[in-house]
């Protein structure tokens, strides 16, 4: 695992968590949402919405790609509504920092192609990605995103989750540092 040691990323991280921010860590079995307000950790919550868990469920339901989006949305919304009531309340979250093995590599690569250091994705770029994932074939997507074909559905599920959470929180920006935050990095920053 790699921590944010790169000072430029560390700077961006600190600047971003000064505002109301959520760190979204998407794993295979669950997702973890950590809320920051003025760079203080407010809450950390695990939801059973992992990408591999959802993929297994979709396979079990024999879901085609057309139903996939609706089903992931429904499954996520059910858990996220409770989450919102309990933890978000009326907080407006400005930014989401996403940590995963699915979307982040794509966002980082896109940023490098544009010659930018930080992989910040706004709503427009995100909509374009969703549209591509919705309409293009797996083989073409794998080529374009430079990933293995079996990873494409996982990227799609991750994107649907991220979009749902961004909508729920009213977030404007998604930042993918392209590193795994080490456990405790949040606390490290909060304690400084």
Where are these regions (language model features)?
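Helical "lid/coupling" subdomains associated with nucleotide-phosphate turnover
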Residues: 1, 5-20, 35-38, 43-192
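Active-site-adjacent helix-turn-beta-strand microarchitecture at beta-sheet edges
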Residues: 26-30
